[in-house]
Amino acid sequence: MLRIGICDDSAEARLGLRAMLERLLDKRAVECQIYEFSSGEGLLGWMEKHTGEIDLVFLDIEMGGLNGMEAAKALRERSDALQLVFVTGYTDFVFDGYAVGALGYVMKPPQPEQIGDVLTRALAAQFNEADKVFLCRNTDGLFRIPKKSIRYFYSDRR
């Protein structure tokens, strides 16, 4: 399952991207769970409480308050595994997007071919990461522990 976040201050843009993602993933027979956020602050607040529960985030750059680039920098400080894609009408930020390790940069309005390409890369990266990490869930969230850092497992009455 691919867990996706869409962060855009435009409800219309979120709805359109959500519909496109659902259509494209349905064609690929990939289950998805999509979360919507109207601000960078909302996204960061949710991610703080739900660590590791989103795999891929589509971010608008120009938003009121915390913009998408600032949100991406904060997200990147918390996780290198989270995949970031900028969806914006501005070309000025292309190089900034790659500085935070963005998976892609899509111009508005997004086209199915562009989003399909991003999904192909996101799914390939997720598949590759699944071989490299051990997923562990506890009351604080979902954690991806690199397998190479695991020395042993210990279970206490479980």
Regions found by a protein language model. Give the residues of each.
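Conserved Asp/Asn-Gly motif in the active-site loop of CheY-like receiver
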Residues: 34-42
